[in-house]
Amino acid sequence: MMQHASPAPALTMMATQNVPPPPYQDSPQMTATAQPPSKAQAVHISAPSAAASTPVPSAPIDPQAQLEADKRAVYRHPLFPLLTLLFEKCEQATQGSECITSASFDVDIENFVHQQEQEHKPFFSDDPELDNLMVKAIQVLRIHLLELEKVNELCKDFCNRYITCLKTKMHSDNLLRNDLGGPYSPNQPSINLHSQDLLQNSPNSMSGVSNNPQGIVVPASALQQGNIAMTTVNSQVVSGGALYQPVTMVTSQGQVVTQAIPQGAIQIQNTQVNLDLTSLLDNEDKKSKNKRGVLPKHATNIMRSWLFQHLMHPYPTEDEKRQIAAQTNLTLLQVNNWFINARRRILQPMLDASNPDPAPKAKKIKSQHRPTQRFWPNSIAAGVLQQQGGAPGTNPDGSINLDNLQSLSSDSATMAMQQAMMAAHDDSLDGTEEEDEDEMEEEEEEELEEEVDELQTTNVSDLGLEHSDSLE
């Protein structure tokens, strides 16, 4: 040990004087360190001149030993327990569904500081580099814990909103579009698509079907024969793992189909059975509404009762039309068109039936003696006859013959009657055609028909006019 402390005065003397230092190979320390073979020492031994000009480095340390020494230094550091606690919290937040909050780590820091102060332990070591390393590691894990907390909050928010959306849009009651406790509620074991009267008419057959544990599927030929009502639905898993919905059918005559499942039978998939049944029900309920020009019976009964109660003035006001539309579940246009057609086809035949028959005949006979210049002035008729080569139809006194005048007006009368016929046909569809004429135009058409009847000398029935006497 005395020889190990001697190089310091030797280096000082070497710096002040030019005296060469003693040879190192003769010292026992050099011989002891030269025993393990190393590359650096071989260079110094082979070149004594180089060793004399440069200082000899210290002996190298094994990397594994250096690593173990660094580990021991980290383990002995005062901040290592805090670093370990933070690392465990990050592991728990990563593995489990419940994330450790950053507030809990703040509490742990306060507890650690109080404990260190009570035990009078330092927070740092004598190595500043190691202290800086420990502080940086704690900061990195702290940031990592904050990021894990944010990710966990986002995941929880997404899951909650997704579950709420599924409950809202994919609930069975919303799919069936019916209230809870209705005939199509999923709580009931059977789905009833026919009226209660049909089920009451065949109680024996229905009781036998409801107790059948296995459902029956009706072949395609049975569906093409007529109306079919589904009475019970039982889930069944067939080969391949697919879930189907076997259905027991009841025809419109009340007969229960009890055939076995044949080849090519219709199978209703479980995921689509609710929507298919609902669409079938909606189509059957709205079948009559889709027919053009046919109003519901209860609506026509309400409007007909109002019409008979106001025979003296069968013209409802706008407020009354709105009230009737609300009662009948119709539009204002449908209500207005119905009353227009009802005044023509219901009230007018009643008035005609109440009047005696000789009155129209007398009116027609009287109309033949009207002066002809109302429709065809003498000047116009005489000019037309002269252009045709004379006036063969004129009387000796210069007046116009009535037969010739009526023959001239036959074409125009026919056209007028055809127009009136087309207008009446357009109004035959109740509640579907738009209202293209008001009450004043109605009265003008009636006057036009009366004038045409007055001009016609032939029977009106020869024109083949057909009028509908019923109002749907």
From Swiss-Prot:
Keyword field contains DNA-binding: yes
GO biological process: regulation of transcription by RNA polymerase II
InterPro entries linked to this entry: HD (IPR001356), Homeodomain-like_sf (IPR009057), KN_HD (IPR008422), PKNOX/Meis_N (IPR032453), TALE_homeobox (IPR050224)
Signal peptide positions (record): none
Region (Disordered) residue spans: 1-62, 351-371, 386-405, 422-472
Encoding gene per record: PKNOX2
DNA-binding region, residues: 291-350
SUPFAM superfamilies referenced in this protein's UniProt entry, alphabetically: Homeodomain-like (SSF46689)
Subcellular location as annotated: Nucleus
Compositional bias per record (Polar residues), positions renumbered to this chain: 26-38
Tree of life domain: Eukaryota
Name of this chain's protein: Homeobox protein PKNOX2
UniProt feature, compositional bias: Acidic residues: 429-454
Keywords: DNA-binding, Homeobox, Nucleus
Biased composition (Basic residues): 361-371
Domain MEIS N-terminal: 96-179
GO CC annotations, alphabetized: actin cytoskeleton; cytoplasm; intercellular bridge; microtubule cytoskeleton; nucleoplasm
Start-end of Low complexity biased regions: 46-56
MF annotations from Gene Ontology: actin filament binding; actin monomer binding; RNA polymerase II transcription regulatory region sequence-specific DNA binding; sequence-specific double-stranded DNA binding
